[in-house]
Design a protein with these regions (language model features):
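Multi-pass membrane proteins that catalyze or facilitate reactions on polyprenyl-/lipid-phosphate substrates
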Residues: 1-72, 76, 83-311, 315-454
């Protein structure tokens, strides 16, 4: 990605040559290994590669797809890759694009989770996480600021964000109820006062012109992307079978209360609630994985997010860490198969977390294209996105508390951690430094502190 960008004033008028399935396969495989930087960075990479350099689709078609991926629960960057793959090469193109977006990070996280759980007490590893944890707190604060600055366009949306914060922080209201309440407010409010809900968290169209694209603004919708009730039923039935078969096997073989079964059911629910991306669903994962089931500890949850920030792929892949640690610590396959238990748990939760995203795109792609700019459809999203801001602020406080006061408020403030957190926040918010660079520097500081260079 070092070639110069096209000059928008001298855009090419001829579309590029048609792209074969295997050419696209090569790109999606590459993307799976370079998709660092969270959803914003991943979407930027796809925009540069697919719109600017390769011209596989136009700016308008790209943003149209992105806006509707934002409507759906689930990781929007992975869904966008699935959507574009589907638009270009039908169902198999969508499946390949979505799977390759996730697969490298799954294997990396299984390996890193094993190193973490097996060697986490080694001095340099402990020091690395000591430095990264405060950086993660700053990253979550940055996420709240970024989403809030885009989503809270008026006082009503600000009030929704404040109410969601109070609900989850002070009243411990479950995250699903917060999402439902926000959606209802948006649904009703979009009819009563539409002006308050027309400035939601979508992505505005750009006037940039990078040349004629393979799928251009006026390119007719491919036949496979035209809505068909029969095709919709086929996709929904196939998706249900792909969910029901492994779930049924787990229930019949292990019982409903087995760790594998509970993980599969819990992360199925989590997949349907990830409006606003990974940061929005993490409080729900925390409520279940830490407080309800005890699969991991609060400290491990923070460490898992740190690992998720440093690997390619969707940030929601932190669920693979939760699954691995839970399966490993619970020794669900016995004391002699700890790694296998962790790896199977990681793969299970990844399957049940991402399966709904594929169903949403393959089944709903034709439908959501027909609802472009329909306020009845987008107003609930606007309200949910506002509520997500309050939830993320709560998440930042949760991480800050456990990082800066490791013994609770009765103990003393961890001054080095506080200084690292402040420095990371300044680097991210004021100087707009790369997240990976900030994490790397903070990790090195943690190692130095661990070895006594205070």
């Amino acid at each position: 990605m070092t070639s110069p960008l096209p000059n928008v004033n001298t855009a090419q008028t001829e579309p590029p040559a048609s792209v074969s399935f295997w050419q696209a396969f090569g790109f999606w495989l590459k993307l799976g290994f370079i998709s660092f930087g969270g959803p914003a960075g991943q979407i930027a990479i796809m925009h540069e590669e697919l719109v600017v350099r390769r011209r596989w689709l136009s700016e308008k078609r790209f943003l149209h797809a992105l806006n509707y991926c934002m409507v759906l629960p689930g990781p929007e960057a992975q869904q966008l890759a699935t959507y574009i793959g589907w638009l270009m090469h039908k169902t198999r193109g969508g499946i390949v694009a979505g799977v390759l977006f996730v697969l490298p990070s799954l294997f990396l996280l299984i390996a890193l989770s094993w190193i973490y759980i097996a060697y986490g007490q080694v001095a340099w590893v402990a020091g690395l996480f000591y430095g990264i944890k405060p950086a993660v707190t700053a990253i979550v604060i940055q996420a709240a600021h970024r989403i809030g600055s885009r989503a809270l366009k008026n006082n009503l949306l600000l009030a929704i964000a404040a109410a969601s914060f109070v609900a989850i922080f002070a009243l411990n209201v479950p995250f699903p109820l917060i999402v439902l309440a926000a959606a209802l407010i948006g649904f009703v409010g979009g009819r009563m006062r539409p002006e308050f809900f027309s400035a939601g968290g979508g992505h505005a169209a750009s006037q940039a012109n990078f040349g004629t694209a393979l799928i251009n603004d006026d390119t007719p919708t491919p036949s496979h992307a035209v809505f068909s009730f029969k095709r919709l039923m086929q996709v929904l039935l196939s998706g249900f079978v792909l969910w029901a078969l492994p779930m049924g096997y787990l229930v019949t073989q292990n019982g409903w209360d087995h760790t594998f079964t509970q993980m599969s059911w819990f992360f199925t629910k989590a997949a349907l609630l990830t409006f606003g991306g990974a940061y929005a669903v993490l409080p729900y994962v925390y409520q279940g994985a830490v407080e309800q089931f005890g699969w991991i500890t609060a400290t491990q949850m923070i460490d898992g997010l740190a690992l998720g920030e440093t690997t390619p792929g969707p940030l929601i892949m932190v669920v693979a860490f939760v699954g691995f640690v839970g399966g490993y610590v619970k020794a669900v396959l016995g004391p002699d198969s700890l790694f296998l238990a962790g790896a199977l748990a990681a793969m299970l939760v990844t399957w049940f977390t991402f399966l709904p995203s594929f169903i949403f795109i393959l089944a709903g792609g034709p439908f959501v294209e027909s609802t472009h700019n329909d306020l009845k459809f987008t107003a609930p999203l606007t309200a949910i996105t506002a509520a997500v801001v309050g939830v993320i602020v709560n998440l930042a406080l949760f991480f800050g508390y456990h990082t800066l006061w490791p013994q609770g408020f009765t103990g003393s403030l961890d001054i080095p951690s506080a200084l690292i957190a402040v420095a990371a926040a300044v680097a991210l918010l004021k100087f707009k430094l790369n997240v990976m660079h900030v994490i790397g520097v903070c990790g090195l500081l943690g190692i130095c502190l661990q070895y006594g260079l205070k």
